[in-house]
Each structure stands twice: as C-alpha cells, then as structure tokens.
Regions:
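A charge-rich, low-complexity, intrinsically flexible signal that marks solvent-exposed coils, linkers
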Residues: 1-90
Length: 90
C-alpha cells in the first residue's frame, strides 16, 4: 500500500466481519470506496451505481460510523463524476 493509499484509507477502520482479500479476489486490483476492507468497488459506472445503492441501505451503513459513511459516500460521488454517472442523494 502506498503512502497515498494509506492516507486515503486512514479514515476507515478495519471491520472484523470482512475479509478484504475476498473483495480483491472478486473484483481484482480496482479502486474501492472503502479501501481498508475492499468494499464498494468504484472502478466502472456499474460498480459506482451499485456502491451508491448499497451504502444507502441502512443495514450496510450501520456497519460504519457516521464519518466513515461520509468518507465512503464522498469517494463514490467523486467516482460518479469521473465515470459520468448521475446519482441521487438518499
């Protein structure tokens, strides 16, 4: 992990209920909105839409504190702009 990646991911804690290797195995070496746990891939328009949908489910958001959810949503919004994807505030 580069120092830039560490800085970007320092706002999210490692979750005990997740195996980060699973996300990397499933999606490959892609950008994640939660790079600590390799959750919410945001490398394609389809993944951006799915990430936005999932983080806005209360049960998924409840696994993070409010600051972490804001960080994840911010990363998804940036990826949406990059991939020209329109998302609506939930």
């Amino acid at each position: 992990m580069t120092s830039h990646e560490k800085q970007k991911s320092s706002q999210i804690d490692r979750r005990d209920d997740v195996r980060p290797n699973e996300g990397e195995h499933k999606y490959g070496d892609v950008e994640f909105a939660d790079p600590v746990n390799n959750k919410y891939p945001i490398d394609t328009p389809e993944h951006v839409r799915a990430a936005w949908s999932y983080i806005n489910h209360k049960d998924n958001a409840a696994k993070y504190d409010a600051d972490e959810v804001r960080t994840i949503k911010s990363r998804i919004k940036r990826a949406a702009k990059k991939h020209d994807v329109e998302i609506e505030e939930a």
